[in-house]
């Protein structure tokens, strides 16, 4: 099932709602942060066993990044930790060029990655500073849609597991909005909470 998640609820809340409505075991092929919107690919019943076929698919996003400040979480929900002068268009393009292709990016502290057996975001909430590991990501597309004032809107296509918030931080800002538009061959325009895609049909598109 393809669902267009609105900003606000967690991905797990969307999964739980479908589980309540269907009474079937339900999972997902990649979460979205609560502040983010866009495409979730949900798996129900026996299809949950096929999660590995979908989790590793590339993702596409549109994001608005505020280049005047970094936040503690890389999104609008965190505290401002640094004020910055927005870069010129030429400097922005230089920063973008460094992030295209294969890159190593620090995993955000406000993430579900486990550090010493505990979720990183729980450590961050308690004010415990830890050295976050990096993750190798592949950035296929990183294009400017618009750049006005301190706000840049980007279209980006990245490998599974890439944190767009980490890209925003590397550019010298934080995500104000984030919308997932594609998961592999599936697009947000196809999202319909009332349509169940048969597993065979979904697999045939990969």
Question: At which residue positions do the language-model features occur?
Answer:
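Catalytic/RNA-binding core of pseudouridine synthases
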Residues: 1-206
